[in-house]
UniProtKB/Swiss-Prot annotation:
Protein name, UniProt field: Vacuolar membrane-associated protein iml1
Segments forming a coiled coil: none
Feature: compositional bias, Basic residues: 725-738
Example of a GO cellular component annotation carried by this entry: vacuolar membrane
InterPro entries xrefs: DEP_dom, DEPDC5_CTD, IML1, IML1_N, WH-like_DNA-bd_sf, WH_DNA-bd_sf
Gene that this sequence comes from: iml1
Keyword annotations of the record: Membrane, Vacuole
């Protein structure tokens, strides 16, 4: 976080980028004096004083060796025997110092210990004593060449010393090397600059002296939850020595590196990790969302620098620098870039949509705001950071058209009509971007963080952390609404992310980043109400005293409130109370300022330019004045070229504000938060000036009336300005107050000059000097003739000639009004007037001014609410009306006069009464009597209060709900006078306070955060007081105890383990462990001491108490003595209100216009910005961890399990892959795919989680060798199988493995069984299942499956222990001709292979056994069917084959079950507990829920879903990688895909939406289905409405992923183990895994890129040459996987060669892809090109009727280049041998491969894959049977 203005005493904070931490801000003499004082007793970081160890080992000289890992794996070997005289013991902390460091160190007159252990004061902003000490004694590194480059930053012994803990030397090494004293590994020697056999000095040091305060730990290419970080620290770091560059390996899988170590704010090379050390984890593989605010200033020119527009700073400066730093750090981030802006429209545009104004979260401006709309343009989404050139190219292209696209308004704007070809909306340029000040920055941030609510779904397993960078052309000040600030703050706080804000404008003169907001006016405060309809511009005369009841909620100085009395605030008076500006600095926002010149110098330093500035030094500041504000109109008006160029220029916009108050009605004059009033850092340009005016026409008219009077008054003022005070005072007493506002300049200071307030007060009564005396007795004035309450109406323009100097000023500055620059008094004159005031009142006024840092340096009319709390605390007595009209009040402290609830009647008769009647100036122009009266009144009614923020004010302001919601996440401050002591408070940084080892600078770019964002720290000190905890929080206690009776559950068995798991769960959900004194004081009876959160033994003790916090929620966990854990949840009352509002549906709906990557135009979206108010049921979660799980129906959704989904996509099996599969070379491609799935199921079964108690009971290895997954393989889609063979899926026998049917006494033995008896047993009821089975077009009678027979042999043979033995015995039986393969192609195999009993052993049956059991039970629900032949009766499989011969005109028969009225239910997937840690590397069970398909079609995807609650993700990632490597050997690609369907992606990821592709030519009605279906007994299936769409998808290598819910029969309840299918459309996925496609009901395609695919890559085992890649076709993964494990993460992903093979449909388009990111676009390009080609579509439609094919999308086989291969037609006997084709079905030609059917012109494939495989088998084997029986 940035030091929002607190780093320097002055608020004029100009800090050079070279002011680094090592630069001293103190004198050397003072530092040396402090060093002498601290040398004897150095102090620790907590201020305590420690004495040095009295041990004898103090700077002992020894010889250091350097060894490698072959010598010893220990990093440091220390021989204690060589130092026996020193009393060194095991566990002592020893430091090693190079002899060179000691020699070059301090003089010998001082103790060496002093140089090693010098301490510093706790103030880390002052220079370290160690640095100063070394500086004063020439303690510099002279031999830098011998050190590494990193050593150049470490100058003192404390920073360069090497620490280690003494431990015994192994006996073997001690025996072999008795002379060894000290030895370090080569890696340690390189870090510290040690040389082999060199001399070093060792000393024993205290742990407190070398304990690290912070340790930066970086990691990449892995997803780590914060609970894993906590466990890593406890296991690998706590109580150990850490050093820079140290490699950390946790559980053999999680890898991290120590980047930086800090001791008392200084970087060191090594340190001790104490219980108070704070680990800071930083991710080098994060997801970055870069928001670029395209506000109006982006197109402004940089007049001070190169003259480019500000956007050039982004595209040519900041972003290239950022990408270069990423590349240098080898960071592998994913980048999303979004351009956003808020467009303001002119309300006068005819036909403006009435809903346009509601397209915002909340109106952030005044009541009469202009209609606005927020626009978002997604440039890139999740692109690898290494492709930065591509990112910049895309950004430049979008910038060219961005302004045009957002400025055009279509009237009327009808989304339906705009997309229609018949209606062309009228396009007009109706808007312009708003300024950065009034942009939609909070809405953009909230939108980006909204997807984190679904962070547990579709978890990316190789990236950790989300960082949001906002690049703005502004200076860090934003006007926002209170509601948006509160909701965004609450969302970011609960989700644990921080924002980096990069400003392109110079840093302003106040604290930043700053949010201006107006707190809402809640009910119940009638005196504060608007008094009228604000939105309608209502005005209530009763509320004309706006300052009477102010409430200080923002802890500003009273000075800031006085801005409300500016001339522009006159008509706004009634609403000033509710609309006073509040200023807040959020702790979740880090601000940086990009200065191109600074980083040009840094580049020169890196390039070793001799003229570059010296590093680590401060360049002497130039004394030349450097302007902070450029006034474009003054520069262009020729003022500076005139003879008066040495005079003061007019104040900014003073006349415009004053004049606009004259005649503008209250509704239109309420413009206090305009951009030109506030943002001083940006120069005013013509566009921005005119665009912010409410009504320029009114301003011009008002100026013409006041021109002459203004000039005359200024001339008179010039005559008086140099008169002595006494003369002027005497003159004023004589002539009465002719210039009531003239003395305003007397108390004006430099701060007032910043705000243009002085000149406006000087001119407020310039035309009516005697206005006030008449005003008191003035009669009622009609409201229609009301003039400004702040400035009375001016006379008509005088005919006297205006002085010449008045006409030399450009009218552009003030809206064509005169502005004589001579009117300004110099600063010296102002000071003179201020000191010349009478002492009676000057003391108070000047004193307040000296203390005040005027808030009006922000703006001329910026409002505040500073006097509110004081007024409420000390009510002022009511004064008579005449006293209330007193015109004189000190300008530095405006009086707040309380208005009685019952306003006097006479007050309501004065609607035009001037504010000056209540607030004037105390000057010499008033009578002495009035001044004395006012002074007395001021002293009596105004309490004295300080200008700084105090805890008392903070606490009092937090009494209202609005402040409590923001505090402490947004600090209310006075931005122009932020106290140093307030900003030094560690709580200033909120939840991120422990991420900063030292306070950051504002003026420099936070590269550390931008390069590697920090993860939310594990610990925090943010905690409420005991009283707040008791009064403001609701408590919910409950108890949790381990479930001792949990069977088969990986539940913790002890209270200590349960405690750790509960803490881990909360850490992974964004909680932080609370440490520090606050929690100790607030914990009451548990207040023993802050526990060591990194010590497991401490946490497991009885009575151990741990507090965890997250936003407004606090959890207290207490280990009780009764084997229980007491949990108390503290929820803030305001948060409970938010939860109740959320339940009532009060979430914010944000309407915006967004254009995603592939969209052609902006679409209106309505996004529900869900409140992150906590709804998580922690009671259920804790009990689930403890093992109580019976009460949860769907824990994965109820408890927000982490969930990821994978699919196994069948791809072409390459020839080279077959070489490594010699045993299965006889299998075809489809069989190999199923064999791969079978191999995975064997792995799953092998690593199935078995509780330890079950392992002890388990005695038989047979049960372990079983494979009970029982996946049913079918060649039809699941919906077809459900409709046709429901009884098969509902059969309970399929749910589990066949039971052991033979009793133990009747078990068989291989040596004593005969073939005939075995054949009888196998075919009996106790034998293996035999039934009729169909595969593709063929039906096989009375056969069994090899895998089931293998299981049967293991169960029923006493002497068969393993499945391998069963397969061996089965092959012997096959050789003996007991059974044979149905096609006689395979030996006996353990898989999905079909076998039949030989005819000589076959038992005759009256009917075919065609189900799992001998007969179907009469109570089973089956579809109603007509009577058929005996051979086909009751057989769903045979009936399915028979359906094609049924007459089309046959009467339709309902297919609903005839015996049951309730729906039948069927589960299409199963689940098991899988152990991802079989090697037991973790100290806890690592178990996940593995869901897999129960029914699978080998042509489709095989689905896998993983869910877990508290398991280590890195172990899951390693497991999935091993699965992917196994599947890749069998032609299966494991790809991660989103859980939700593609059409719903925008519900979880706001910056993505599917791309719609339409067919240029609507397809004709598809042919009737020719697939045999059991539901077609008496009817012909209706034509598939999406037949041709599926055909096109199959042509482009798409395979079926999930079917739509509507595809399943409505009378069947279909479910999965992970939930019910909810897909609206059927979804297909490309074989590369990069593209998802859905077919809508209208027949359109919804296309979405799968951005998760490239995180799931596996290095190939074999080498692939170019020919192989050509045959592989489109395989973008293959060419880069061998180069890097995760190409998506690589900053330099190599180009993809031959991305489209010759057989691929995209082969005809030239492809020059540079990254995997482009792969989906190339697939989409060819796909969309085909859909838009009428000729190719027509050819496809016509050919499909000649040769109808199955519309089922299926994979292709090996590619074939030649399209001239003649299509081979299967002979009729081959087909007729199995089944006759249905009547009327044309003979379909077959080809050798699918790819051969794709001709060069993209004609349709002419082959059904099932027939293709039969033909392949016939050619290859020469068998008369051509059908391929799978596995």
């Amino acid at each position: 976080m940035s030091m929002r203005g607190s780093m320097r005493r002055s608020h004029l904070r100009q800090v050079s980028a070279a002011s680094l931490d090592s630069v001293s801000s103190r004198s050397v003499d003072t530092a040396q004096h402090d060093a002498l004082q601290l040398s004897d007793h150095p102090s620790s970081s907590d201020g305590k004083t420690y004495k040095f160890s009295s041990t004898g080992l103090d700077r002992r000289q020894c010889s250091l060796w350097v060894h490698d890992e072959t010598f010893s794996k220990e990093e440091i070997l220390f021989n204690q025997a060589a130092f026996a005289d020193t009393g060194v013991r095991d566990g002592d902390l020893i430091e090693i110092l190079s002899a060179r460091t000691v020699v070059d160190g301090p003089s010998s007159g001082q103790s060496q210990s002093h140089s090693f252990n010098l301490a510093v004061k706790p103030d880390m902003r002052t220079r370290s004593m160690r640095d100063v000490h070394g500086h004063g004694h020439s303690h510099v590194e002279t031999a830098s060449s011998s050190r590494s480059h990193a050593m150049s930053k470490f100058k003192t012994p404390l920073q360069t010393r090497c620490l280690f803990i003494a431990k015994p030397l192994p006996n073997e090494i001690r025996t072999k090397h008795p002379k060894l004293e000290l030895s370090v590994t080569s890696s340690v020697a390189n870090i510290f600059g040690f040389k082999n056999r060199s001399t070093v000095y060792i000393s024993i040091v205290e742990q407190t002296q070398c304990a690290a305060s912070h340790v930066d730990i970086s990691f990449r290419d892995q997803f780590l939850v914060r609970s894993d970080m906590w466990r890593l620290v406890m296991s690998e770091l706590a109580g150990k020595i850490v050093y820079k560059g140290q490699k950390i390996v946790f559980m053999g899988s999680i890898k991290a590196t120590v980047k930086n170590i800090f001791i008392r704010g200084k970087k060191v090379l090594s340190g001790f990790f104490s219980p108070q050390t704070i680990p800071v984890f930083r991710s080098e593989s994060a997801k970055y969302v870069l928001f670029i605010q395209m506000s109006r200033e982006m197109w402004d020119f940089d007049s001070e620098g190169t003259g480019d527009i500000l956007f050039s700073r982004v595209i040519n400066g900041f972003l290239p620098e950022l990408f270069k730093r990423w590349a240098n750090a080898d960071a592998r981030h994913l980048v999303t870039i979004v351009l956003f802006t808020r467009v303001e429209y002119d309300a006068s545009i005819t036909g403006l949509p009435s809903t346009l104004n509601s397209e915002n979260l909340k109106n952030t401006s005044e009541p009469n705001h202009a209609p606005t709309r927020d626009f978002y343009r997604v440039v890139v989404n999740d692109m690898a950071s290494g492709h930065w050139t591509t990112i910049l190219d895309e950004l430049k292209k979008d910038f060219r058209t961005f302004l045009r696209d957002v400025s055009i308004l279509k009237v009327p704007e009808d989304p339906v009509a705009s997309t229609s070809a018949s209606t062309t909306p009228k396009a007009t340029i109706g808007g312009r971007p708003s300024t950065a000040l009034r942009g939609n920055i909070l809405e953009a941030i909230h939108l980006a963080s909204s997807h984190l609510a679904f962070d547990h779904i579709d978890r990316d397993m190789v990236h950790t952390g989300t960082s949001i960078i906002v690049i703005t052309p502004g200076s860090g000040v934003f006007e926002v609404s209170y509601e948006s600030l509160a909701s965004t703050t609450e969302a970011l706080t609960n989700r644990g992310i921080a924002i980096d804000l990069v400003c392109l404008s110079p840093m302003p003169l106040h604290s930043v980043p700053l949010f201006k907001y107006r707190e809402p006016n809640r009910g119940g405060r009638s005196s504060f109400s608007y008094g009228g309809d604000i939105q309608g511009g209502g005005y209530s005369p009763e509320m004309r005293h706006p300052f009477a009841s102010l409430t200080n909620r923002t802890h500003f100085s009273p000075k800031s409130t006085f801005s409300s009395t500016s001339p522009a605030s006159g008509p706004r008076g009634p609403w000033t109370r509710a609309n006073d500006w509040s200023y807040g600095i959020p702790h979740w926002l880090d601000i940086s300022y990009w200065n191109p010149e600074t980083y040009r110098e840094s580049r020169r330093i890196l390039k070793k330019d001799p003229n570059a500035p010296i590093p680590f030094t401060v360049t002497k500041k130039s004394k030349l004045f450097k302007s902070r504000v450029r006034m474009y109109e003054i520069q262009m008006g020729g003022v500076m070229e005139s003879e008066q160029s040495n005079i003061s220029i007019p104040y900014l916009l003073e006349d415009q504000i004053t004049s606009r108050s004259l005649n503008v009605p209250p509704k239109t004059s309420f413009r206090r938060n305009s951009h030109f009033n506030h943002q001083l850092s940006d120069s005013l340009r013509p566009g921005s000036f005119l665009g912010n005016m409410t009504n320029p026409k009114e301003t011009i008219l008002s100026r013409s009336r006041s021109a002459s009077a203004t000039a005359a008054w200024m001339d008179n003022y010039d005559d008086n300005v140099f008169r002595s005070f006494s003369k002027r005072n005497h003159r004023r007493k004589q002539t009465k107050p002719k210039r009531p506002s003239e003395p305003e300049v007397q108390v004006s200071t430099t701060h007032d000059r910043l705000s243009a307030r002085s000149i406006t007060h000087l001119r407020e009564h310039e035309t009516k000097p005697n206005e006030w005396p008449r005003k008191e007795a003035a009669p009622k004035i009609p409201a229609t003739k009301a003039v400004s309450p702040r400035k009375p109406a001016l006379k008509a323009p005088s005919k006297t000639k205006v002085p010449r100097i008045s006409r030399t000023i450009s009218f552009a500055l003030r809206g064509l009004g005169v502005a004589p620059p001579r009117a300004q008094a110099s600063t010296e004159v102002n000071v003179e007037h201020a000191t010349g005031l009478p002492s009676s009142n000057t003391k108070r006024s000047a004193g307040s001014l000296r203390e005040s840092k005027s808030i009006e340096s922000l703006s001329a009319a910026s409002d505040s609410t500073s006097t509110a709390t004081v007024v409420e605390a000390s009510p002022m007595p009511s004064t008579p009306p005449r006293q209330r009209k007193s015109p004189t009040i000190t300008p530095s402290r405006p009086i707040s006069i309380r208005v009685p609830l019952k306003t006097p009647i006479e007050d309501s008769d004065q609607p035009t009464r001037s504010v000056a009647e209540s607030f004037g100036t105390n000057g010499a122009d008033l009578p002495i009597t009035e001044k004395a009266s006012l002074e007395h009144q001021t002293r009596k009614s105004i309490p004295r209060f300080e200008l700084t923020t105090s805890p008392g004010l903070r606490e009092s302001s937090a009494k209202n709900l609005q402040s409590r919601l923001l505090a402490p996440w947004v600090r209310s401050i006075n931005p122009c006078n932020t106290p140093r002591e307030v900003s030094r408070d560690t709580s200033w940084f909120g939840r991120w306070q422990h991420a900063y080892p030292r306070p950051p600078h504002v003026a420099v770019v936070k590269w550390k955060s931008l390069k590697s964002p920090a993860v939310l720290p594990l610990t925090t000190e943010e905690f409420p007081t005991a009283s707040e905890l008791a009064s403001d929080y609701l408590q919910t206690p409950y108890r949790v105890f381990p479930n001792d009776d949990a069977e088969g559950i990986e539940a913790p068995k002890t209270t200590g383990l349960l405690m750790r798991e509960m803490i881990s769960l909360r850490l992974s959900h964004g909680f932080q462990i609370v440490v520090g004194n606050n929690v100790v004081e607030a914990s009451g009876r548990y207040a023993l001491r802050s526990p060591n959160v990194f010590d497991t033994q401490t946490l497991e003790m009885d009575g151990a108490t741990v507090f965890l916090s997250k936003g407004h929620s606090i959890h207290r966990l207490v280990c009780t003595g009764g084997n229980e854990i007491e949990v108390t949840r503290f929820v803030h009352r305001s948060l409970s209100d938010l939860v109740s509002e959320k339940k009532n549906g009060l979430d914010i709906v944000y309407s915006l216009a967004m254009r995603t990557i592939m969209s052609r135009e902006y679409d209106i979206k309505h996004i529900n910005l869900r409140s992150s108010a906590e709804e998580y049921n922690w009671n259920y979660a804790d009990n689930y961890i403890a093992g109580h799980r019976d009460y949860l129906f769907n824990p994965a959704q109820q408890l927000h399990f982490w969930r990821v989904r994978f699919v196994l996509i069948p791809v072409r099996l390459h020839v080279h892959a077959r070489r490594h599969m010699q045993p299965i070379n006889e299998d075809n491609e489809e069989e190999i795919h199923l064999l791969g799935i079978n191999q995975l199921t064997l792995i799953w079964q092998r690593h199935k989680y078995v509780p330890p108690e079950e392992k002890r009971i388990e005695t038989s290895s047979k049960s372990r060798d079983q494979n009970p997954l029982n996946i049913l393989y079918q060649t039809r889609n699941p919906s077809e199988v459900v409709a046709a063979e429901l009884n098969l899926l509902a059969d309970p026998g399929l749910e589990s493995s066949p039971a052991q049917l033979l009793p133990e006494s009747e078990l068989l033995e291989r040596s004593s069984i005969s073939l005939s008896s075995l054949a009888q047993i196998v075919q009996s009821d106790k034998g293996v299942r035999m039934m009729d089975r169909r595969w593709h077009w063929r039906l096989h009678y009375n056969c069994f499956i090899g895998s089931e027979f293998t299981t049967w042999l293991c169960q029923n043979f006493r002497d068969i222990e393993t499945r391998e033995e069963a397969v061996e015995f089965g092959n012997k039986l096959l050789e003996l001709n007991l059974f044979q393969h149905v096609e006689q192609r395979h030996k006996f195999r353990d898989g999905n292979y079909f076998y039949q009993i030989s005819s000589e052993y076959r038992v005759a049956r009256p009917e075919s056994r065609n189900s799992w059991f001998p007969q179907i039970r009469p109570d089973k629900s089956i579809p109603s069917t007509p009577a058929t032949a005996d051979n086909w009766k009751d057989s769903p499989l045979s009936a399915h084959s028979r359906s094609a011969s049924v007459d089309q005109n046959a009467p339709q028969t309902p297919t609903t079950p005839s015996r049951s009225k309730s729906k039948a239910s069927v589960m299409l997937s199963k689940t098991l507990k899988y152990d991802v840690d079989p090697r037991k590397r973790s100290n806890r069970p690592e178990v996940i829920d593995l869901h897999y398909d129960r029914l699978h079609n080998p042509d489709n995807c095989f689905h896998i879903e993983l869910s877990w609650m508290n398991t280590t993700p890195k172990l899951i990632e390693d497991t999935v990688q091993s699965w992917a490597a196994t599947a890749e050997k069998f032609g299966l690609k494991l790809v991660q895909v989103p859980i939700a369907e593609a059409s719903a992606i925008d519900q979880t990821q706001p910056f993505r939406q599917p791309y719609r592709v339409k067919l240029k030519v609507p397809p004709p009605k598809g042919p009737s289905s020719t697939i045999f279906n059991a539901a077609s007994f008496s009817q012909q299936d209706a034509p598939d409405p999406h037949y041709f769409q599926k055909l096109i998808l199959k042509k482009f290598d798409f395979v079926l992923d999930f079917e739509a819910r509507s595809a399943f029969p409505p009378d069947v309840e279909v479910g999965y183990s992970w939930g019910r299918p909810d897909y609206r459309y059927s979804q297909y996925i490309h074989q590369s895994g990069t593209l998802l496609v859905q077919i809508t009901d209208e027949g359109d395609f919804l296309v979405l890129a799968n951005r998760l695919v490239s995180t799931r890559t596996v290095p190939f085992t074999g080498t692939r040459d170019r020919d192989h890649r050509a045959r592989a076709g489109y395989d973008p993964m293959g060419t880069i996987e061998r180069d890097r494990l995760s190409p998506r993460l690589s900053p330099l992903v190599r180009p993809i060669h031959d991305i489209a093979g010759p057989a691929s449909p995209m082969a005809h388009s030239s492809l020059d892809s540079a990254s995997l990111y482009r792969a989906p676009e190339h697939v989409l390009h060819g796909f969309e090109e085909f859909c838009n080609d009428p000729v190719r579509l027509g050819q496809l439609y016509s050919e499909s009727f000649v040769y109808p094919v199955s519309a089922k999308a299926a994979p292709t086989t090996a590619s074939c280049v030649d399209s001239s291969i003649p299509s081979l037609e299967l002979p009729a006997p081959v087909i007729g041998h199995h089944i006759s084709p249905p009547p009327g079905t044309p003979v379909r030609p077959e080809t050798r491969t699918r790819a051969a059917s794709t001709s060069a012109n993209g004609s349709l494939p002419l082959i059904d894959p099932r027939s293709r495989q039969r033909e392949e088998s016939s050619v290859a084997r020469g068998s008369p049977r051509s059908a391929s029986i799978m596995l």
